[in-house]
Structure formats: C-alpha cells, structure tokens
C-alpha cells in the first residue's frame, strides 16, 4: 500500500530492506510537492505504526502532474451558520468538515463526497417545527467529529478549480468561483482560473 501510494505521488523506490520482526525500511526519491499532506495518509496506511523521515536530496526534473483528489466536494449553497440537524442528515453523503454553528458561505467546501463529482448541499436547513406533540418522534442528533486538517493536507487536496482561504482563526477550502451559475459558465467556456 505504501509503495502504491508513493508511486501515485511520483515517488521512486530506491531500496527495500527487511529490518527485523515485521518491519521494513523503504527509501524513496519523491518530489516535495508529492509529499505535501502525505504524513497523515502514511499514518493511516500503517495504522499509526509507521515512521516517516524526509531529507532534501536535490532538485530534479519535473515528473508531471500529480493525481488530484478523486472524491467530489460537498459545497454549501448559501451563507449562514451550519445546523446540527442538517449536518446529521448529510453525514451519509460524505465526510463533513463543519460542525454545528460554524459559519459557512456559498461556494465553501463543507465536506468530501464518497464519489467523484461535486454536490451542492444545504447545511443550514433546520428541523421543521410543527404543532403536533407526540412522544418518541425526536431523533437524537449525534454528529461524527469533523476532520481537522493541516495546511499541507488541505493544499494537497485542492483541485484546479478550488482555493484555500487562510484567516487567523480558520482554514477553509472553497471553490475559486463561489457562484454555481458562474462556475458552470466557466466550465463550459473552458477558461482557466
């Protein structure tokens, strides 16, 4: 799995050594841009038991474009604050980056879809309140913890039509063009961002 993931990041395996009981030492040459955000991926692949070290080897030739993120983005459709009820119902659609009461805006990436292709969602939709009072109808809203990512991880996730917004208090992924109509026009015209 490690070799495969490094190959996708343009890494070349130089050496593979067996260092004892269920331990291997892999030495790669890889471009620095291929290693951005890789530490968390590496720890996931090794189930937290791997150790990764990096040393700058030198400048090399351009190895080509990196494979982008395969998953689509879950994009907020309007400005406002995220609501727990909406997030709870949308968790089945993908991994969420926002939690209850987080400010969101149109074009902001609020999660990752499990499949390719972006999906515009409403994370501000509250529960419909009715005058009916029946027992046992309220469902307990349990939110899965949001994924906290470093700058390097977020930069490695960016597609060509996306941007990373950095403020003193937060990091937000967003579409370069916030308005969905303008995004579609730009896609059809093929104008680079």
Task: Describe each PLM feature range.
Residues 1-193:
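Accessory interaction regions appended to the cores of large information-processing enzymes
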């Amino acid at each position: 799995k490690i070799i495969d993931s490094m190959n996708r990041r343009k890494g070349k395996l130089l050496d593979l050594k067996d260092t004892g009981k269920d331990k291997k030492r892999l030495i790669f040459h890889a471009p620095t841009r291929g290693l951005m955000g890789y530490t968390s991926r590496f720890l996931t692949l090794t189930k937290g038991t791997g150790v990764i070290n990096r040393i700058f080897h030198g400048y090399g030739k351009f190895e080509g474009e990196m494979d982008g993120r395969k998953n689509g983005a879950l994009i907020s459709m309007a400005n406002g604050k995220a609501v727990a009820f909406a997030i709870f119902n949308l968790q089945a659609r993908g991994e969420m980056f926002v939690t209850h009461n987080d400010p969101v805006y149109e074009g902001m990436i609020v999660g990752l879809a499990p499949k390719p292709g972006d999906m515009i969602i409403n994370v501000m939709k509250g529960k419909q309140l009715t005058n009916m009072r029946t027992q046992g109808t309220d469902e307990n809203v349990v939110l899965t913890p949001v994924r906290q990512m470093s700058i390097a991880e977020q930069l490695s996730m960016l597609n060509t039509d996306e941007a990373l917004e950095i403020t003193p208090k937060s990091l937000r992924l967003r579409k370069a063009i916030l308005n969905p109509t303008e995004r579609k026009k730009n896609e059809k015209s093929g104008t680079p961002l």
